[in-house]
């Protein structure tokens, strides 16, 4: 005979919930996330723990480069950050290390017209990078295996864990008998649960489907509904960011924040950054656009 369990055994402790809300009230309200290092981007997106973010953009837009710069900014602001990276397109791995060192040292690694980092600067920069970044083995191919491996590093309560899978499209997806839409929905639900349970922040880099050029030859900004696989990307993700730039005209970079689930962490809108190609860093441009740009989430 099935045991009847009183409903009161399953609800949240209401007194504890009330007291937690009161504590937040007296502290000023729900907190923002951690700064990206760019005040203009912080207007629209801050990094909350226990969440996940989609980063997308057309090929060559710099989405991986921007994400690297974001992680360096986070670790410089708070040394507790540890990032687990799966980034097979950043090959060889030593090249990815060098790019992160350049961002840390603010000098180029290679010989050239710009003042190059010294061997001691490389040594200190590399030591810093290796304190905050580790690379997952590329023989782990499925999103489930990679997330499990990354989350095995969450044991130290004094560290903040960030996980990057870049890009999603290169992973091996074992769908079994499921269609792609159902598979994407299932895996992304798992990403949400893992982030919530562990307090990690997960970034998934996702290539959009092929996007046709405008009549003037420019390429439109990809939207969440252009992502390869499923509209579940928009429904499931906590945050969606598109990195976009004109690859011919210059180094102005558009950071399109197209979804933010929790209003204390940000809002939709557009911030502009300037890209320094020599060391791979991004700098503020005092030009921000309010969120009406994305008033209709169904726009294409």
Give the residues covered by each predicted segment.
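Structural recognition of the conserved hydrophobic beta-strand(s) that form the central parallel beta-sheet
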Residues: 85, 164-165, 200-207
């Amino acid at each position: 005979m099935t045991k009847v369990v009183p409903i009161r055994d399953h609800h949240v402790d209401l007194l504890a919930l009330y007291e937690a809300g009161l504590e937040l009230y007296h502290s000023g309200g729900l907190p923002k996330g951690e700064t990206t290092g760019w005040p203009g981007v912080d207007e629209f997106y801050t990094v909350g723990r226990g969440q996940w973010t989609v980063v997308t953009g057309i090929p060559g837009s710099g989405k991986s480069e921007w994400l690297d710069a974001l992680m360096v900014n986070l670790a410089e602001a708070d040394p507790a950050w540890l990032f687990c990276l799966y980034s097979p397109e950043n090959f060889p791995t030593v090249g990815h290390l060098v790019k992160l060192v350049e961002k840390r040292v603010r000098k180029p690694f290679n010989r050239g017209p710009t003042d190059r980092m010294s061997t001691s600067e490389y040594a200190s920069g590399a030591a810093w990078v290796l304190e905050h970044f580790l690379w997952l083995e590329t023989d782990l191919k499925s999103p489930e295996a990679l997330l499990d491996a990354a989350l095995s590093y969450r044991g130290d309560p004094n560290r903040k864990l960030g996980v990057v899978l870049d890009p999603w499209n290169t992973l091996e997806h074992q769908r079994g008998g499921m269609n792609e839409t159902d598979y994407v929905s299932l895996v992304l639900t798992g990403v949400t649960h893992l982030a919530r349970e562990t307090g990690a922040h997960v970034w998934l880099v996702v290539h959009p489907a092929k996007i046709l050029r405008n009549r003037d030859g420019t390429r439109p900004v990809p939207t969440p509904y252009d992502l390869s696989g499923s509209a579940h990307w928009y429904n499931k993700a906590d945050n969606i960011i598109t990195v976009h730039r004109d690859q011919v005209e210059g180094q102005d970079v558009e950071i399109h924040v197209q979804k933010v689930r929790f209003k204390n962490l940000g809002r939709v809108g557009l911030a502009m950054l300037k890209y320094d190609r020599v060391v791979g860093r991004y700098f503020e441009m005092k030009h921000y656009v309010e969120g009406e740009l994305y008033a209709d989430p169904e726009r294409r």
